[in-house]
């Protein structure tokens, strides 16, 4: 089990759930925000969030938050929080592709003892 000071946090998916979570963690602890969308990473590095989930001021306050689209940077982390979308398909079933792909990505860098937390929002219609 990790001591709190040993945690190296990575947030996977910087959407409406992941970015605010990464910002709050990044105000307190070293945190890596990962997203496969290079444009998303570029805008966050420029201090802008087009989704308006966080303000420019909040982004500035997260002094311990780094952003990347390079999955190899995840090797430094030992606590992963996955916040990828689970959209509904034409048959009103959740599309788990983003969840599966992010799990495969983490699996490439996962070490014994690492922790993975999944935060999923599923809408049943």
Residue positions per predicted region:
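Aromatic pocket-lining residues of Rossmann-like dinucleotide-binding sites
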Residues: 25
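N-terminal Rossmann-fold NAD(P) dinucleotide-binding loop
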Residues: 18-19
């Amino acid at each position: 089990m990790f001591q709190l000071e040993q945690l190296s946090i990575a947030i996977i998916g910087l959407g409406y759930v992941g970015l605010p979570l990464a910002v709050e963690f990044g105000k307190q602890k070293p945190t890596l925000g990962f997203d496969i969308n290079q444009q998303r990473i570029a805008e966050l590095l420029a201090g802008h969030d087009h989704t308006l989930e966080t303000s420019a001021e909040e982004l500035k306050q997260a002094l311990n938050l780094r952003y990347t689209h390079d999955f190899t940077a995840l090797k430094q982390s030992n606590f992963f929080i996955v916040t990828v979308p689970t959209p509904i398909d034409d048959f009103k079933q959740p599309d788990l592709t983003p969840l599966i792909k992010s799990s495969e990505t983490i699996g490439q860098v996962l070490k014994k003892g690492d922790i993975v937390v999944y935060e999923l929002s599923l809408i049943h219609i």
